[in-house]
Structure formats: structure tokens, C-alpha cells
A protein has these predicted regions:
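Enriched but not universal
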Residues: 4-5, 20-70, 77, 284-288
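Hydrophobic h-region of N-terminal signal peptides that target proteins for export
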Residues: 10-18
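Small-residue packing motifs within transmembrane alpha-helices
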Residues: 3-11
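Generic cytosolic/nucleocytoplasmic N-terminal low-complexity/intrinsically disordered segments
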Residues: 1-4, 17, 33, 39, ...
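Conserved positions within compact, well-structured domain cores
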Residues: 56-288
Length: 288
């Protein structure tokens, strides 16, 4: 194994890809007392992470990619496309603060885009699946806008359940699509979750003034849904936000799964529905 020779230092060093050594200030790192020490790269990584964790004061606090610290509510997380998401701590759960808008799984494989906008999921060229006929993973964008359009910016993308639960993983590394139980824990965290998890944004239907108070920073927006038929329903009306979980409905697990819905005028509760897996919903990611 290739060794890296480190001169006498009081703090750790980190090797670059070019074999160079860059000195880093890491308070709390174990002091190297001998004049010349030989470390392999894996040893350096282990010590780097140990020092970062010991000096991280946030709650929760873990080592992030490359050994850096992560503090939920302050730190951000990026998906494989480079989109950056703010984070929010609600109880003991760390959530992304906006909806997912990634086009690839974590291994770089593209998620099929369905931009047909048709009303029949079996139409020519469509990858969106009519119920019971297919299990093709896909995502779409409201009104079939481009990925940098206003709707994509505001609401993220809509994914069917096959994309959400693909083993290649849709959330950033170290994050996952919440289970039914995990989303239920979010809903039960406080009273009147329909109001407190809803954004104060005017994107919600203005017929219900002050529809959200966003007490915790979850900032749910009315991204609507794409029906299993391929048509967009309750979309851009400002009425609903739909979120997938990774949990199938055990009474008919091959066709339906659990989603949560926030309605414009329901400030007390958040709906939980068994929904066709071909439907397109928003996705929030939860830290492992």
C-alpha cells in the first residue's frame, strides 16, 4: 500500500489526489509527536473524521462527505446533479427543506423523464404507466416545463413510486425517502400539522388567507400530483401538496403505497392515503 511521509506537525494532514499533502487546522486532532511518521491514506481519513466529530457541536452532529461536519438546519446537502438543499431539524428528524429535483440515481443512471403530458398513460412515447400495466420508473415536471422552469424551481419534480424505491437510490447518499412510520412521526410531532408544516407562500390558493404558518421550516408547497393515467390533477391550483413514502400498502403491496397530503384549507390534519404506485408525487429526503 502506498505510504505518505508526513513531517513533524501538531495537527493532521490530508492527502490530495495528486499525492501532495495539504496541512489542515483540526483542533482536537491527536498530536503526532514523533519526528517522522508514515501513514497510509485510510489512516489519515479515519483520524480526520475522528477530529471532525469531536469538534462538532451541532445537534445532530455527524461527519459529512470527506470527513467534514454536518449540522442539520445549518448545513446543506447536494444531490448527484449538484442541486443543493437546505435542511431543517424537526424533533429528532433532519429533513430536506425543499422538494427533490434530481434526474439521476446515485450511481449516475438517468431516471426516465416523461414529458408527454398525455391523459392516457398508454399513449405513444409515454413512460408513465397506467395502473396495473407496468412498473416503469419515471419523473415528470409540472406542465411539462423544462427542468429550469418556474414550476421546477418552485415545486421540484414529481416521481412515481418505482423511481422513489429503486435500489439505486434517489436521495443523496446518507439520506432516504421516509417510511410511512417516519412521515407519521413528522405529522404527530405537534398539533395542527396541516398549518404548521405548510409554507406561508402565496403559491397556496389565495382563497384561504394565511393558509400556512410554517412553524418548523418544513415549508410544504402545493406541487400537486400526476395521476397514474398520466394526466396532471390538482396541479397549479394551489390546493394540495403530496409526498411519497417508501412504504407499500400491505393490503395490496404491488400496486398501492402510502402518501401524505396537505390541503390548502385543512390546518388541523394531514391526509394519509393508499395511492397507485404509478402516481407522481413530490419527494422529501430524510437523513439516515
Amino acid at each position: 500500500m502506498k505510504k505518505i511521509i508526513v513531517a513533524a506537525i501538531s495537527l493532521f494532514t490530508l492527502a490530495t489526489l495528486n499525492g501532495q499533502v495539504e496541512q489542515q487546522s483540526l483542533p482536537g486532532a491527536e498530536e503526532i509527536s514523533n519526528r517522522r511518521s508514515s501513514f497510509n491514506l485510510e489512516e489519515i481519513k479515519v483520524r480526520w473524521k475522528k477530529a471532525a466529530l469531536e469538534n462538532c457541536t451541532g445537534v445532530p452532529c455527524t461527519t459529512g462527505p470527506g470527513g467534514g461536519s454536518f449540522t442539520c438546519g445549518t448545513s446543506t446537502v447536494a444531490d448527484i446533479d449538484g442541486n443543493t438543499y437546505n435542511t431543517v431539524l424537526i424533533g429528532t428528524q433532519c429533513w430536506t427543506k425543499s422538494n427533490l429535483k434530481v434526474t439521476k440515481y446515485n450511481d449516475g443512471t438517468a431516471i426516465p423523464l416523461d414529458a408527454s403530458g398525455g391523459t392516457n398513460g398508454n399513449g405513444a412515447g409515454e413512460t408513465w404507466s397506467a395502473r396495473y400495466t407496468s412498473s416503469t420508473a419515471a419523473y415528470s415536471i409540472l406542465s411539462n416545463e423544462p427542468s429550469n422552469g418556474t414550476n421546477a424551481t418552485n415545486y421540484g419534480f414529481l416521481y412515481n413510486w418505482y423511481a422513489v424505491t429503486n435500489p439505486k437510490k434517489i436521495c443523496p447518499a446518507g439520506w432516504h425517502v421516509p417510511t410511512d412510520a417516519e412521515f407519521a412521526a413528522l405529522v404527530s410531532y405537534s398539533t395542527n400539522p396541516g398549518n404548521k408544516l405548510k409554507s406561508t407562500s402565496a403559491l397556496w390558493n389565495p382563497s384561504v388567507p394565511g393558509a400556512g404558518t410554517d412553524n418548523f421550516g418544513f415549508s410544504a408547497l402545493p406541487g400537486g400530483e400526476r395521476a397514474f393515467s398520466g394526466s396532471y390533477t390538482l396541479t397549479l391550483s394551489g390546493d394540495y401538496a403530496y409526498f411519497w413514502t417508501s412504504s407499500p400498502d400491505i393490503t395490496h403491496p404491488t400496486v398501492d403505497s402510502w402518501q401524505y397530503a396537505i390541503h390548502k384549507s385543512d390546518n388541523t390534519t394531514i391526509g394519509r392515503y393508499s395511492t397507485p404506485q404509478e402516481s407522481g408525487d413530490s419527494v422529501r429526503c430524510l437523513k439516515d
